[in-house]
């Protein structure tokens, strides 16, 4: 109880004390208040009044810490007392709180509130409460430098900037936006910036920046540096053309800015140049303008701005003036030294430089390259190795550049003069100690006198030396710099010459090494050099090195052993720059340092990780078994980073894998495995190789070699050996067969020839054959095919084209045949083949023979192909009847009347053509020309019948003596004499394939003319027979009188030969000529009374010529005429069968006396005046046999042309016309004279021969080329009126008249026969 009372008393006492304190406003804990500047804040202070009773009066005081008097006092209702700093902003809030408006940073601090009760006593120390006011404010400058501040160049300046704020701001300095930090140039501390050593680069704007979390404050100050101007925009190099304006700019800055600009050209004021001051202007901004620039204005221009402070700066630029090339100061005389090289120089001035310089000498262009020893240099000068007098002259040059030229130079005369020469030469070397005197002599002479100068090669010497007037070089005191090479130069207007000497100064320190080279690696450097002159003493070297970024005091010295001139420096840092230099020293001192070489050591190679290479194995390996081996195929890897280089194929038979091929191309996808063992199980796998990386193996493919057969051996060409063997065997078999066939053919041919040699030569025969005009063999050449066709015929060739079977004569008919016909029939049993045309030969005619009986008549026997038939009479020829082959001639018209007509001949008559030979050349005309007396005859005016031999119809209108379209040979007759139409035998190409021309066709019946096949197909002979002569009316000598015939009034065509030269007689014949038989007696001519008229025979002579349709006829040679063969001998009165198949009467003539005194009767006579000296060939044995008088068969030569038309059959429309041939000229004839014309015994007749003058082949050779050959021609006329009769009696031939000669060529039977060597004939006169 007592405790409870004590506690209650204590609590009452406590409560009473607390109430007393509250009532007095006492607070012990301070209060913190924060506000932002510019805002209002309340500082609280509470007053507690008693619960009961009236509140006592009190006074409120607010104190700020640091202010001795209250800033705010309030009592009762009286107005408050406010400190002036708070006036308008402080007021009482509530009972005792203080309200501050628009607080400032200065308002921040501690505030104390006191409440004084007027009715109580209390301790003032304990009375009151505290409040701390915090004001947050952005920075504000309390101190800043001026906006512009000046400083002298070279001095220092400090700029201070102070800022206040809550929290306290941080102050920094910036220049042109760049933060400045403390360095050697700038010092920054507590908002102050100090700039030392002010320069022009320090000028500009400086910024003070104060910042805190409440914001920032910035202040800028411009620093102006007082000093000389600074060039902001210097001038630049420009290029202008001549006569243009140039503009050079220059802009400078300075403080103070009273700038003036001055321009200089080549360090001289532009206004001081006389030629330039009138054309320049300087603008206020410093720009220089040059008007109408000239080439002389080019150069360096300098801009100098100034403001009277310090040293003015300068900036330079170059002006380039472009202009065409020109020549300046061309000397009037050019001196060129004699004996040494010299120069002809052209002083060219051009911008851009000249590209071409052309020279003129004496007004003509000079081609420098054509002068030996002259060279045109790049600058346009001419270098002459050794000038001669040829170089003398006046020279001008014309330079060109891209802008052209200003013209040529002034003329300069070249003068040759002797060059200067040295009279005293310096020595090769001079050695002298340093500090001593030295004199080096040198003297020269020349015209003009040369000037001598001395120069040091390389670095010039700065020692005391001079050149004496005599030319010598004098050193008063030698120094180290005088060491080296010196040259003495003698110069005049001609040229300059030099002489060299070497000066060695001993007793000095070494010279600096040269050519320092450094080769580095990552940690080493190899330093090498070339030693300089040692000064006369032994020298050593040391290498100095340092890092490039170190200072000049960081050089390290490395000694070099005695001898070598290199040093390997190691322990270097990779990828670091080092500097090296070499120093030499001897007993007298050290040399200068060599040049400093800076190098960088190599860096360590950067180790880069190897790229991930993805190598996958090949896919889908398969094995296909074949008979030759195993075909392995696969697919390339699915993913691979690099191209596949190759594949590796492996195989195994057991457990071990072996390599089959390791070079399979990467582009292949298959492999063929061969040469495998039989009955073995193989397993294969493939691997891919890419850049030395091998993939994993592919899948395994297994195959058995049970059915695999080894591949056959192949050759290098890929053929199997059995195939190759078969090919070789086939080739060998064919070769053997060809060889055997060739040998067999040769053997058979040889046997055939032997049989032919053993047989008696049968008489020639004529076969009818029709050849196509379009045959390719008609071009004048004998092809090998035609010759082969004409060889000895076979049975098949004989029967071809002859459908009728052979007919045997009845016994009665055989008994009626005479002995001669039986013999002829036996001989004619020999078979002949006929050459067929390639295109149109349809059938061959039977072989028929014509012969002459003992009575001199021509008889015809049957051939084996068809029986003999009775001949029919021919209109106009009562002595001839038509037989199987040719008309048979009799002495009366009643003999041998045989009404039978051969069927084969009748069938072939319309098909016969006059052109059958494959050659187009001509043979001589026939040997005899029947000519009727030109009396007043009455005959038919035209031909009305059809030509059976040619298949052409004669037009009904008469065409007397018209020229054919193939024969244009005009006759030449005497004045007043009308030439009769010609009567020539048509030409034949080859007797092997020719068709006989037909005589005039009459109503009594036609007849055909067979061809003459050469026996056994052999070639025609080129030999000729002797010529025969028949005297004519006014052209024969007296012994050759014209006989009169009693049958002059008959009506028949007149036949004659012209007296002109035939175009076949050109080349001289070298063939043997058979002799004429003299033993045959002439027979009297039996002429019926009704014969139409007299016939005169002439022997015309033709000359070689081409086919009339092929071109102009060449002129005949003046000499060397052919001798022509004679016809077989016939008795007088008989009708001789000519080549045209008609009867010619043999006329009797008186026998003239033989030359040489040989008289007596003679059967034939020749005019000896027709001969020229010509060798007489000896006849071959075969020809002699043919000329025997016992043989009486005559084979007539066929013709290609019809005797009626004188033109070949062709596709031309209309009938061919008659043509008159030119009269042949006289040639060589047979020497013997005969009183009558005879016919030679039968011989192989051929008119084909080589006609070229150079032909010297054997008689058996036939012409296969297009050379002309002799062909006889025949001309007919159908009107026998209008021929004037020449006066009777002999008359000497007129000058220019020619005698007609015919010739026939015998043909050897075999190819192997050669004619005997010719014998020279007797020379006969040709005049008369």
From Swiss-Prot:
Residues 512-604, 614-708 form the Fibronectin type-III domain. Residues 1284-1295, 1318-1328 have a biased composition (Pro residues). It is a single-pass membrane protein. The chain crosses the membrane at residues 723-743. One of its GO terms (molecular function) is kinase binding. The keyword Transferase does not apply. Residues 30-115, 139-226, 228-320, 324-415, 420-504 form the Ig-like domain. Residues 21-722 are extracellular. The modification Phosphoserine is found at residues 775, 783, 794, 1207, 1215. Glycans are attached at residues 241, 258, 624. Keywords: Cell adhesion, Cell membrane, Disulfide bond, Glycoprotein, Immunoglobulin domain, Membrane, Methylation, Neurogenesis, Phosphoprotein, Postsynaptic cell membrane, Repeat, Signal, Synapse, Transmembrane, Transmembrane helix. InterPro entries: FN3_dom, FN3_sf, Ig-like_dom, Ig-like_dom_sf, Ig-like_fold, Ig_sub, Ig_sub2, Neural/epithelial_adhesion. Residues 1018-1033, 1129-1141, 1199-1214 have a biased composition (Polar residues). Residues 990-1001, 1246-1273 have a biased composition (Low complexity). One of its GO terms (biological process) is homophilic cell adhesion via plasma membrane adhesion molecules. Residues 744-1328 are cytoplasmic. Disulfide bonds join 45-113, 161-208, 250-303, 346-397, 442-488. Transmembrane protein which is abundantly expressed in interneurons, where it may regulate inhibitory synapse development. May mediate homophilic cell adhesion. This is Protein turtle homolog B.
């Amino acid at each position: 109880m007592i405790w409870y009372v004590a506690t209650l008393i204590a609590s009452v006492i406590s409560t009473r004390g607390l109430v007393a304190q509250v009532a007095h406003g006492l607070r012990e804990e301070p209060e913190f208040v924060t506000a932002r500047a510019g805002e209002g804040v309340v500082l609280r202070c509470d007053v507690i009044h008693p619960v009961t009773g009236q509140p006592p009066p009190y006074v409120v005081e607010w104190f700020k810490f640091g202010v001795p008097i209250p800033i705010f006092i309030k009592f009762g209702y009286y107005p408050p007392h406010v400190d002036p700093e708070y006036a308008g902003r402080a007021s009482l809030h509530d009972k005792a709180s203080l309200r501050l408006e628009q607080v400032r940073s200065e308002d921040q601090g501690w505030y104390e509130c006191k409440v004084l009760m007027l009715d109580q006593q209390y301790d003032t120390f304990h009375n009151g409460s505290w409040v701390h006011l915090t004001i947050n404010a952005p920075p504000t400058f309390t101190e800043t430098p001026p906006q512009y501040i000046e400083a002298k160049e070279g001095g220092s300046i400090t700029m201070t900037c102070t800022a206040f704020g809550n929290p306290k701001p941080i102050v920094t300095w910036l220049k042109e936006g760049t933060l400045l930090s403390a360095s050697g140039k700038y010092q920054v501390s507590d908002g102050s910036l100090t700039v030392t050593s002010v320069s022009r680069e320090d000028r500009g704007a400086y910024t003070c920046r104060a910042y805190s979390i409440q914001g920032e404050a910035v202040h800028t100050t411009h620093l102006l540096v007082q000093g000389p101007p600074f060039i902001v925009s210097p001038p630049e190099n420009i290029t202008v053309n001549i006569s243009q304006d140039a503009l050079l700019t220059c802009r400078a800055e300075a403080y103070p800015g009273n700038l003036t600009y001055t321009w200089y050209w080549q360090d001289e004021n532009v206004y001081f140049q006389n030629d330039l001051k009138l054309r320049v202007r300087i603008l206020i901004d410093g720009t220089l303008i040059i008007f109408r620039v000239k080439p002389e204005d080019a150069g360096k221009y300098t801009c100098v701005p100034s403001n009277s402070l310090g040293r003015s700066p300068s900036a330079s630029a170059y002006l380039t003036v472009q202009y065409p090339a020109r020549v300046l100061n061309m000397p009037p005389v050019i001196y060129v030294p004699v004996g040494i090289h010299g120069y002809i120089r052209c002083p060219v001035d051009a911008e851009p430089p000249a590209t071409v310089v052309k020279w003129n000498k004496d007004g003509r262009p000079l081609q420098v390259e054509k002068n030996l020893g002259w060279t045109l240099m790049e600058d346009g000068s001419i270098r002459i190795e050794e000038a001669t007098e040829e170089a003398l002259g006046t020279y001008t040059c014309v330079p060109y550049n891209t802008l052209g030229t200003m013209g040529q130079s002034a003329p300069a005369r070249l003068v040759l003069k002797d060059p200067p020469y040295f009279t005293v030469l310096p020595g090769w070397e001079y050695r002298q100690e340093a500090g001593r005197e030295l004199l080096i002599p040198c003297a020269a002479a020349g015209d003009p006198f040369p000037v001598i100068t001395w120069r040091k090669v390389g670095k010039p010497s700065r020692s005391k030396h001079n050149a004496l007037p005599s030319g010598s070089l004098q050193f008063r005191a030698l120094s180290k710099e005088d060491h080296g090479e010196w040259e003495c130069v003698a110069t005049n207007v001609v040229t300059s010459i030099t002489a060299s000497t070497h000066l060695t100064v001993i007793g000095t320190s070494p010279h600096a090494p040269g050519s320092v080279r450094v080769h580095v690696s990552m940690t080493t450097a190899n330093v090498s050099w070339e030693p300089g002159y040692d000064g006369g003493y032994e020298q050593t070297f040391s290498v100095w090195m340092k890092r490039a970024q170190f200072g000049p005091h960081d050089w390290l010295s490395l000694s070099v052993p005695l001898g070598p001139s290199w040093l390997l420096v190691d322990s270097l840092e990779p990828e670091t720059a080092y500097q090296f230099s070499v120093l030499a020293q001897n007993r007298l001192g050290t040399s200068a340092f060599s040049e400093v070489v800076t190098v960088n050591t190599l860096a360590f190679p950067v180790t880069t990780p190897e790229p991930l290479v993805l190598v996958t194995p090949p896919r889908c390996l398969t094995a296909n078994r074949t008979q030759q081996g195993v075909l392995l195929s696969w697919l390339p890897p699915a993913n691979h980073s690099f191209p596949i280089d190759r594949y590796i194929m492996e195989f195994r038979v057991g457990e071990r894998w072996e390599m089959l091929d390791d070079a399979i191309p990467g582009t292949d996808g298959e492999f063929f495995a061969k040469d495998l063992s039989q009955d073995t199980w193989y397993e294969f796998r493939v691997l891919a190789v890419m850049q030395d990386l091998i993939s994993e193996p592919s899948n395994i493919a297994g195959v058995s070699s049970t059915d695999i057969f080894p591949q056959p051996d192949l050759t290098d060409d890929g053929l199997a050996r059995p195939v190759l063997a078969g090919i070789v065997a086939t080739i060998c078999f064919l070769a053997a067969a060809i060889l055997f066939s060739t040998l067999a053919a040769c053997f058979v041919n040889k046997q055939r020839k032997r049989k032919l040699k053993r047989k008696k030569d049968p008489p020639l025969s004529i076969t009818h054959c029709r050849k196509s005009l379009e045959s390719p063999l008609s071009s004048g050449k004998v092809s090998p095919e035609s010759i082969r066709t004409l060889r000895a015929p076979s049975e098949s060739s004989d029967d071809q084209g002859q459908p009728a079977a052979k007919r045997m004569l009845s016994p009665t008919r055989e008994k009626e045949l005479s002995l001669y016909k039986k013999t002829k029939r036996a001989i004619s049993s020999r078979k002949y083949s006929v050459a067929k045309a390639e295109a149109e030969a349809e059938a061959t005619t039977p072989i028929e023979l014509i012969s002459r009986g003992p009575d001199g008549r021509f008889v015809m026997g049957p051939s084996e192909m068809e029986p003999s038939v009775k001949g029919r009479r021919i209109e106009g020829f009562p002595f001839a009847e038509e037989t199987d082959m040719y008309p048979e001639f009799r002495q009366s018209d009643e003999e041998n009347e045989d009404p039978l007509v051969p069927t084969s001949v009748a069938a072939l008559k319309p098909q016969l053509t006059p052109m059958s030979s494959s050659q187009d050349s001509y043979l001589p005309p026939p040997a005899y020309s029947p000519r009727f007396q030109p009396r007043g005859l009455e005959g038919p005016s035209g031909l009305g019948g059809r030509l059976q031999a040619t298949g052409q119809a004669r037009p009904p209108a008469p065409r007397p003596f018209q020229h054919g379209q193939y024969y244009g040979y005009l006759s030449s007759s005497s004045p007043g004499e009308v030439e009769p139409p010609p009567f020539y035998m048509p030409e034949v190409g080859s007797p092997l394939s020719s068709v006989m021309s037909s005589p005039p066709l009459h109503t009594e019946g036609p007849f055909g003319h067979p061809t003459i096949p050469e026996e056994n197909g052999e070639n025609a002979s080129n030999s000729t027979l002797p010529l025969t002569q028949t005297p004519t009316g006014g052209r024969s000598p007296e012994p050759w009188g014209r006989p009169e015939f009693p049958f002059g009034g008959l009506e028949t065509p007149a036949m004659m030969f012209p007296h002109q030269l035939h175009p076949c007689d050109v080349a001289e014949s070298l063939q043997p000529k058979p002799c004429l038989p003299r033993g045959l007696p002439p027979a009297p001519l039996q002429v019926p009374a009704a014969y139409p008229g007299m016939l005169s025979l002439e022997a015309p002579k033709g000359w070689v010529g081409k086919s009339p349709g092929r071109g102009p006829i060449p002129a005949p040679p003046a000499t060397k005429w052919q001798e022509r063969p004679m016809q077989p001998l016939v008795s007088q009165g008989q009708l001789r069968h000519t080549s045209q198949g008609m009867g010619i009467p043999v006329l009797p003539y008186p026998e003239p006396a033989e030359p040489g005194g040989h008289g007596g009767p003679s059967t034939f006579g020749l005019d000896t005046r027709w001969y020229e000296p010509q060798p007489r060939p000896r006849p071959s044995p075969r020809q002699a046999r043919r000329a025997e008088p016992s043989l009486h068969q005559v084979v007539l030569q066929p013709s290609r042309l019809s005797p009626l038309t004188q033109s070949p059959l062709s596709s031309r429309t209309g009938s061919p016309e008659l043509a008159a041939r030119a009269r042949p000229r006289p040639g060589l004839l047979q020497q013997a004279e005969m009183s009558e014309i005879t016919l030679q015994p039968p011989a192989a007749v051929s008119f084909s021969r080589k006609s070229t003058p150079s032909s010297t082949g054997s008689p058996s050779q036939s012409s296969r080329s297009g050379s002309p050959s002799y062909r006889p021609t025949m001309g007919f006329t159908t009107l026998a009126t209008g021929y004037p009769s020449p006066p009777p009696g002999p008359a000497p031939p007129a000058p220019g008249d020619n005698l007609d000669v015919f010739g026939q060529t015998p043909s050897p039977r075999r190819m192997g026969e050669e004619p005997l060597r010719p014998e020279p004939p007797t020379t006969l006169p040709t005049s008369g």
